[in-house]
Amino acid sequence: MASTTEVRVYPPDALPPKEAQLAWKIAEMATTPFAIDAEVDDMVANRIIDNAAVALAAINRAPVANARSQALAHPRAGGATVIGLPGDQMFECEWAAWANSAAVRELDFHDSFMAVEPGHPGDNIPPILAVAQQCGRTGRDLIRGIATAYEVQLSLAQAMALNTHRIDHVGHLAPSMTAGLGALLGLAPDIVYQAIGHALHVSTATRQCRKGTISSWKAVAPAHVGKCAIEAIDRAMRGETSPSPIYEGDYGVIATLLDGPEACYRVTLTDRGAPRRAILDTYTKEHSAGYHGQPIIDLAFKMRTRVDDLSKIESVDIFTKRFTHEVMGSGSNDPQKYDPDASRETLDHSAMYIFAVALEDGAWHHELSYDWDRRHRPETVALWRKIKTHEDPEWNRRYDDEPDPLKKAQGARVEITFADGSKLVDEQAVANSHPLGAVPFGRAEYVEKFRALVSGIASDFETARFLEAATGLGSLDSGGVMGLNPVADALVLERAARDQRGIF
């Protein structure tokens, strides 16, 4: 129930008709009604719970608090809610999406998907939820929008690599978010087609945001795209047009940013009206760190029980796939990944740091594991700087050549060499929380993650209220959808009132 289309660059005098363009095919698929099955219904609810958990856990971190203070400058009666703030406070949906997206992304703690282009498809949820609230949509409408967005992002992620051209993975979020909004609102294909052209045109960004000293922009990178997607849909609904063909044009995305004018991509899209189950091929995180590091943390937990004295470690070699080596490993050539003074955003993308701390502590915490004193321990720094990653052909093969997204080997083999020359060797293919892992996440694990992360931030009453709403997602009316962003305790929440620090 899927069809593959070849996407290539055409000269100006031989452009394909609109109906043959990838953006149109995405728009046409997105706007065709489809049946929602129970598994997808449940998983969308799980990801709403997951997003809310990690967002509340990050609620007072500076990038999140500042994004919230920007949203506070844009109130709107009948608008959308902001995570943490009381439900009777509403804001323009694009600004609510901005604030909520930043909160969801900040801790690098929500869902992921690994393909030729990795990504975090849970980033689609905040803008779609914000528009659903402002436009009075139901829980079923919301599920349709979110399931569609996941479908589009995964189709693109499996066909088009952005990272090899140093383009950030949020580039695939622009069409997926826009398609999801079109499905949510029941729009005509031409509106979504025009909006995809707009959103993609302004949302392709370089991967410098994930290189060297990683800045607080990482939290708002998807928020920016979500805001652009909402604005693109609004503009297209008013009859405006956008750059096209955005993929196939000789000055378009493929010709100028990706494989060039001779490129040909094969993109497989779910057929119109077919079930949209791509969300079931994605997975969340048990640990607050880049997804490439999830199995590495779990492997460190396992190996530490066989190490009597960490001070006797001479070296640690992590053999893994290219993505891990270049994005989180020593193959990035970023000295900041070995620097205890580096930003938190940098350290959660340092395989060397997270393996060292996990090996020492046997636990991982979204705050304590990155604490300033924790990262500056002399013994930690000494161990950390003994660790290197290596791109390994076998791990590349197990990742690149496996067609089933869930069966791709994402982990590593670790060799610990001791001062006496002896070695400890072990490997792990996927994280424990992965669908094929030792303890795959189900509804109970999502709920437990939520309860653990919001303890001391949301009241017991609010925790119960939110979980009841989220687990009943498919039956919610438009009023119930307004309750899908949890509220923080007023005594806990910072930046809860509009201020004059910026322009707004």
Where are these regions (language model features)?
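Terminal-appendage/accessory-domain detector
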Residues: M1-P118, W217-K227, D234-F504
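Hydrophobic alpha-helical hairpins/lids featuring a short glycine-rich hinge
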Residues: N100-L156
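Short amphipathic alpha-helical face segments that pack within enzyme cores
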Residues: G122-A130, H172, S176-G180, Y291-D298, ...
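Residue-level signal for well-ordered alpha-helical scaffold segments within enzymatic catalytic domains
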Residues: P127-A130, E231, T256
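Glycine-rich, mobile lid/loop segments that gate access to catalytic sites or pores
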Residues: A132-K227, E231, P243-D250
